[in-house]
């Protein structure tokens, strides 16, 4: 969960620590990865790989950022608008069960969900070496150098490997070497679980070619994405030849593997793209390519350093493998250097998974070994996509933020149609998840009827402007902010008790509540998070309009709506900030989402000094969640750290960071 460590940036990055000798920014281990969750990631924003470091047969699991199942289509439901008013009426009348049944039948998109981001395939490289016979084994990820290394001794020879993903050259590069001449022997093949074939071309090119098998009902041919991967084997000394679907390198001093991959997502020819990339890289010196790659990466990575006083001597930390350090923290050790490594690993992952011109980091960043990934490895816009980018500005990686804005622009057209067809509203809308095909309709179930995704995403526009002061950027992206606000102005409706403006239907992401009659429901009106996101968006729109000197009449409408918006509620029974406009009981008091605290972080409507009563109520809500087991997922615990940072409770922030490391962090961090 290091990708979501903006919490550390909020809490630790602003401190003034006692500077010691530099923390070694290396993850390292004494054994190969036993499974995917122990492999080490590399990426250039578009291509990613998980390197296992296996001795006898290395596995390199590959990804290309645009390789998804599915195809672009209109997923709106033409029946939705006709039933919206009835759903709203039933919710206002407290007949939530009837409203839920009607909403589930008519308000969801068609189809109801997205398909999965997919693995490109696996590269297998056999060495013939016996794992049991090797000595002095080490594998490592050098964060500052953005390179994975594997080394070991066998029979008097030292074998070394290096792997990196170059953004300047657009390829993944692997090098196998030995200190004794003629000792590098490799058998190289590439596989994919479905929808592809592999073959060789010439003596040294291995090709994986395929098309995702996506056949809607009644359609005979696949509409799925075409993709290709080329592996070029270049030995130094020795020879290389093709045998069936395998390349064999024999008696080489070293061997270079250049990997390129592409899809037709942007209507380009993936074969041509792969040939261009491999042919260009083939003409370059390996060490020059590595130097250019590292200079490009360090231009971003070295902008931020972090040092925390550590009771463990530097030499001891350097000589202890990362998994052992993590195990020690689980057993109660205090190792602030591991927090530094974790923080910088988060920055490494964002640089590796999100570069200008590419797609944004998805639910798993860039790395996924499945054909059908958990939660489709999609773009969850009810926190996860946003959380990926919380570190972007505060850790000085503004360029890595840009793919998110490009992606948002690609959603606007679909979001406008969804707003019109489903709600009869102007502007644009996104619900709780999306994909690379522009999916914006409600998905999965009634919990997907959460039309706040576009509004929350727009917070990132203002964040980027606030850090950069780039007025041209704001001019380009302000229409997205205005469009999201226009949708909400049309969508808001007066509730019957006080005449406050509220959202309806409304949902607090993935959570439910118990009504006075004992019925458990998810749909309501005016969920607290909705109100907080609206306040955030409208406020930022007003500020943007002041900066740009535009839309004074629209600004007045926003101010009027803010004045009528339902206020945040503090429970008279518990003193906690209510998650819903009514003081409902929570069936799952330790729920992983803490959506009603959005105004504390990443929003800033609630502050210790500006709104002390709301801040105290938010603290009680946070304490209540934690007392009932909240924070049991890694991303949730990272959010909790951010809450404590905003509440200026450094001790609690630190304790929750230790809990994140101890309970929710895998050996590869």
Residue ranges and their predicted role:
Residues 346, 457, 481, 534, ...:
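Hydrophobic, well-ordered secondary-structure elements that form the walls
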Residues 343, 381-385, 451-458, 478, ...:
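Short alpha-helical patches at coil-to-helix transitions and adjacent helical residues
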Residues 3-21:
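Bacterial Sec-dependent signal peptides at the C-terminal "C-region" and cleavage site
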Residues 16-446, 461-465, 482, 496, ...:
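Aromatic-residue-lined binding/catalytic grooves and analogous aromatic/hydrophobic interfacial grooves
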């Amino acid at each position: 969960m290091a990708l979501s460590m903006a919490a550390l940036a909020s809490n630790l990055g602003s401190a003034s620590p006692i500077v010691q000798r530099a923390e070694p920014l290396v993850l390292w281990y004494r054994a190969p990865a036993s499974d995917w969750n122990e492999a080490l990631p590399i990426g250039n924003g578009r291509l990613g790989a998980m390197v296992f470091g296996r001795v006898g047969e290395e596995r390199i699991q590959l990804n290309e950022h645009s390789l998804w199942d599915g195809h672009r289509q209109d997923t709106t439901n033409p029946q939705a608008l006709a039933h919206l008013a009835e759903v709203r009426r039933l919710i206002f009348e407290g007949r939530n069960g009837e409203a839920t049944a009607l909403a589930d039948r008519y308000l969801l998109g068609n189809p109801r969900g997205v398909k999965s981001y997919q693995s490109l395939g696996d590269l297998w490289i056999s060495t013939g070496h016996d794992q049991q016979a090797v000595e002095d084994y080490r594998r490592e990820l050098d964060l500052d150098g953005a390179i994975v290394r594997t080394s070991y001794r066998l029979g008097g020879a030292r074998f070394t490997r290096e792997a990196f993903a170059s953004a300047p050259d657009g390829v993944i590069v692997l090098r196998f070497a030995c200190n004794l001449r003629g000792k590098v022997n490799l058998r190289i093949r590439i596989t994919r679980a479905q929808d592809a074939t592999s073959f060789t071309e010439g003596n040294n090119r291995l090709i994986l070619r395929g098309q995702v098998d996506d056949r809607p009902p009644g359609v005979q041919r696949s509409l799925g994405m075409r993709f290709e991967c080329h592996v070029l084997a270049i030995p130094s000394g020795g020879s290389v030849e093709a045998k069936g679907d395998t390349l064999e390198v024999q008696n080489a001093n070293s061997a270079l593997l250049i990997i390129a991959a592409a899809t037709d997502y942007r209507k380009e020819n993936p074969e041509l793209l792969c040939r261009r990339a491999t042919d260009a890289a083939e003409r370059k010196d390996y060490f020059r390519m590595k130097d250019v790659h590292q200079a490009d990466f360090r231009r971003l990575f070295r902008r931020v350093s972090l040092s925390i006083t550590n009771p463990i001597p530097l030499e001891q930390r350097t000589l202890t493998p990362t998994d052992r350090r993590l195990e020690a923290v689980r057993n109660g050790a205090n190792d602030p250097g591991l927090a530094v490594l974790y923080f910088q690993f988060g920055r490494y992952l964002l640089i590796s998974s999100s570069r200008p011109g590419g797609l944004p980091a998805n639910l798993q960043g860039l790395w996924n070994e499945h054909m059908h990934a958990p939660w489709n490895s999609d773009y969850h816009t009810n926190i996860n996509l946003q959380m990926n980018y919380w570190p972007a500005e505060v850790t000085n990686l503004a360029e890595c933020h840009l793919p998110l804005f490009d992606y948002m622009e690609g959603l606007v057209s679909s979001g406008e149609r969804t707003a019109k067809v489903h709600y009869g509203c102007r502007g644009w809308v996104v619900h709780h998840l999306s994909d690379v095909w522009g999916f914006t309709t409600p998905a999965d179930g009634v919990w997907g009827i959460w039309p706040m995704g576009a509004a929350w995403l727009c917070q990132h526009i203002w964040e980027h402007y606030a850090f950069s002061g780039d007025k041209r950027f704001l001019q380009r992206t302000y229409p997205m902010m205005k469009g999201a606000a226009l949708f909400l102005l049309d969508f808001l409706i007066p509730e019957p008790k006080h005449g406050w403006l509220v959202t309806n239907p409304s949902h607090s992401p993935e959570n439910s509540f118990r009504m006075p009659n004992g019925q458990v429901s998810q749909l309501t009106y005016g969920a607290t998070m909705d109100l907080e996101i609206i306040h955030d968006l409208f406020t930022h729109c007003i500020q943007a309009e002041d900066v740009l000197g535009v839309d004074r009449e629209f600004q007045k409408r926003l101010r009027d709506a803010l004045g009528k918006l339902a206020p945040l509620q503090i429970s008279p029974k518990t003193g906690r900030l209510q998650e819903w406009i009514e003081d409902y009981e929570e069936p799952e008091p330790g729920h992983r989402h803490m959506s009603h605290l959005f105004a504390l972080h990443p929003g800033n409507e609630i502050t210790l000094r500006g709104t002390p009563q709301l801040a105290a109520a938010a603290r009680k809500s946070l304490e209540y969640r934690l007392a009932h087991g909240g924070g049991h997922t890694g991303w949730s615990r990272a959010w909790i750290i951010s809450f404590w940072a905003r509440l200026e409770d450094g001790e609690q922030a630190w304790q929750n960071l230790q809990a994140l490391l101890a309970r929710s962090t895998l050996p590869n961090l």
